[in-house]
Amino acid sequence: MADITAVSAVYFDKVKTRLRMRSTSLDDEIESHIVACREDMLRLGINAETAADENNMIVLAAIRAYTLWQFSSEMEIAERSRRDYRDMVDDLRKHAGYGDAG
């Protein structure tokens, strides 16, 4: 089973860049949201290998949307990011090989 808690520095930077944060003060929180997102993907039916795949651009986009949803102070952006995240995970789940049933 893939380790969904392992986040490479390069992957972390890709997510953090989307949040437009330069400070390192929230790095631990950002990383915890990446892991929480992966755990949520498992709960929603995505297999662990897919959730932990740092080369899958759809998964990266979903994780970026999730973290933006969690960090945004603007309700409109947060809600749009939440919908984007849920839509991407739902699409992944429906395709063979990505979901637990796939």
Q: Language-model segments: what does each one mean?
A:
Residues 50-75:
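Mid-chain, well-packed structural core segment of small domains
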Residues 69-91:
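C-terminal structural segments of small proteins and small subunits
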